[in-house]
Amino acid sequence: NLFQFARMINKKLGAFXFXNYI
């Protein structure tokens, strides 16, 4: 469960960084 939460956070962070890059 914790691993899934970490994956969700990582995905959100990745999307945030991607949006910042664009």
From Swiss-Prot:
Keywords: Calcium, Disulfide bond, Hydrolase, Lipid degradation, Lipid metabolism, Neurotoxin, Presynaptic neurotoxin, Secreted, Toxin
Location(s) in or outside the cell: Secreted
Top-level taxon in the UniProt lineage: Eukaryota
Reactions mediated catalytically: a 1,2-diacyl-sn-glycero-3-phosphocholine + H2O = a 1-acyl-sn-glycero-3-phosphocholine + a fatty acid + H(+)
Major location category of this protein: secreted
Family statement: Belongs to the phospholipase A2 family. Group II subfamily.
GO molecular function: phospholipase A2 activity; toxin activity
Name of the molecule in the record: Phospholipase A2
Free-text function comment from the UniProt entry: Snake venom phospholipase A2 (PLA2) that inhibits neuromuscular transmission by blocking acetylcholine release from the nerve termini. PLA2 catalyzes the calcium-dependent hydrolysis of the 2-acyl groups in 3-sn-phosphoglycerides.
Organism: Daboia siamensis
Tissue-level expression: Expressed by the venom gland.
EC number: 3.1.1.4
Coiled-coil ranges from the UniProt annotation: none
Protein's GO biological process: lipid catabolic process
Claim: Calcium is one of the keywords in the record: yes
Post-translational modification: Seven disulfide bonds are present.
Gene Ontology cellular component list: extracellular region
Needed co-factor(s): Ca(2+)
Cofactor binding mode and count: Binds 1 Ca(2+) ion.
